[in-house]
From Swiss-Prot:
Catalyses which reaction(s): 7,8-dihydroneopterin = 6-hydroxymethyl-7,8-dihydropterin + glycolaldehyde
Protein name: Probable dihydroneopterin aldolase
NCBIfam families for the chain: folB (TIGR00525), folB_dom (TIGR00526)
The protein's annotated pathway: Cofactor biosynthesis; tetrahydrofolate biosynthesis; 2-amino-4-hydroxy-6-hydroxymethyl-7,8-dihydropteridine diphosphate from 7,8-dihydroneopterin triphosphate: step 3/4
InterPro entries from the UniProt entry: Dihydroneopterin_aldolase, FolB_dom, GTP-CH-I_C/QueF
Active site: K101
Functional description taken from the UniProt entry: Catalyzes the conversion of 7,8-dihydroneopterin to 6-hydroxymethyl-7,8-dihydropterin.
SUPFAM superfamilies: Tetrahydrobiopterin biosynthesis enzymes-like (SSF55620)
The entry's keywords: Folate biosynthesis, Lyase
Gene3D superfamilies documented for this protein: 3.30.1130.10
Metal-binding keyword on record: no
Organism: Chlamydia muridarum (strain MoPn / Nigg)
Amino acid sequence: MYRLDVTNFRVWVSIGVSEQERYHKQPILVSVSLVFREEPKVCSTDEISDGICYAALVSLIEQTAANHPCALLERLAKVLLEKLEESLAQFVCKIDLRVSKERPPIPNLLSPVSFSISKEVP
């Protein structure tokens, strides 16, 4: 199995149930794990053009999150998963995604709240 993991990429997004909560962008952590259909060509060639560019991957995540304001983490995760699948289906057979709200507006909650979603890519 060949897998690429990008862990805890911070994205600033408009998210929240209330208008007040969405008014200021909030930090969201996105982690994604991509399982490849076969050995990526880059493993043999050592050429960046034969692999998935990390910068392009996180840029896709950032742009998608910025262009799709959501009330809830669950919806944001689904939107991101759909975009990743659309962009990477020819290369990957499975996508695991975790979206974490670093600072949920809940008193005494000291750690992020996360939602995870996983999909086998046909």
